[in-house]
Swiss-Prot record:
Keyword Membrane: yes
GO cellular component: plasma membrane
Family: Belongs to the staphylococcal tandem lipoprotein family.
Keyword Signal included in the entry's annotation: yes
Subcellular locations according to the entry: Cell membrane
Species: Staphylococcus aureus (strain N315)
Protein name: Uncharacterized lipoprotein SA0095
One Pfam family here: DUF576
Lipidation (N-palmitoyl cysteine): C24
Lipidation (S-diacylglycerol cysteine): C24
Membrane topology annotation: Lipid-anchor
Signal peptide: 1-23
Keywords, alphabetical: Cell membrane, Lipoprotein, Membrane, Palmitate, Signal
Length: 255
């Protein structure tokens, strides 16, 4: 009888530990979603200039008269098996103080031996934004690059995360020492955002991607660190296909 009672107590304790662990994981998942929701709830922003009138999270890193700067970044990276990784994307710095936007379009080819090293082969093409249009600030000869820049759209302009709460049972990671955190969800090819990416990019795989929300800094809010959204289609040795997006709010450099 005593052995039976000990066995019952042992099993009960085990279930209690599992429940507490699961509860903590679910709580952290909710925290991560809430942290990203502050900016993801703004998607889509078809007219990027609307960001001049939107304020992000402010902390003591901001001067009181600084309205802040939005940094917008979207990139598509494709590495077919055994080939160099090719990535193209754009970064914009939207200064709310001056209501001006500058940045660059970039093209990079990373060979296997280059990984982990400083890249000198990245080509940047400086741009500015006027009336929600991206304009080259220097004349270039490459007509294909010109067309790519003219037609470029950031993910924040067409992405939609209204169903974020419906993403369940994510693979959650949290390191309070850094701090860093991430939540990963398996998507389907019927997902709205996946369809939008396939519509705009020639993605050489039929595999449905995983959505990765990853960041560093205080989960409750911080101008220090970063937050990235990534759609990972393929992640293997010498074969990678992913799309990354970022929308972060930082103190202005001209403050």
């Amino acid at each position: 009888m005593k052995r039976l009672n000990k066995l019952v107590l042992g099993i009960s304790f085990l279930f209690l530990v599992i429940s507490i662990t699961a509860g903590c994981g679910m709580g952290k998942e909710a925290e991560i979603k809430k942290s990203f929701e502050k900016t993801m709830s703004m998607y889509p922003i078809k007219n990027l200039e609307d960001l001049y009138d939107k304020e992000g999270y402010r902390d003591d890193q901001f001067d009181k008269n600084d309205k802040g700067t939005w940094i917008v970044n979207s990139q598509m990276a494709i590495q077919n098996k055994g080939e160099p990784m090719k990535s193209k994307g754009m970064v914009l710095y939207m200064n709310r103080n001056t209501r001006t936007t500058n940045g660059y379009y970039y093209v990079n080819v990373i060979k296997g031996e280059d990984k982990g090293k400083h890249q000198d082969n990245e080509k940047r093409y400086p741009v500015k934004m006027v009336d929600n249009k991206i304009i080259l600030t220097k004349e270039i000869k490459d007509e294909n690059i010109k067309i790519e820049i003219e037609n470029f759209k950031f993910f924040v302009q067409y992405g939609n995360f209204k169903d974020l709460e419906n993403y369940k049972d994510g693979d959650i990671s949290y390191n309070p020492e850094v701090p860093s955190y991430s939540a990963k969800y398996q998507l389907t090819n019927d997902d709205y955002n996946v369809k939008q990416l396939r519509k705009r990019y020639d993605i050489p795989t039929n595999k449905a991607p995983k959505l990765l929300l990853k960041g560093t800094g205080n989960l409750k809010g911080s101008s220090v660190g970063y937050k990235d959204i990534e759609f990972t289609f393929v992640e293997k040795k010498e074969e990678n296909i992913y799309f990354s997006d970022g929308l972060i709010f930082k103190p202005s450099e001209d403050k």
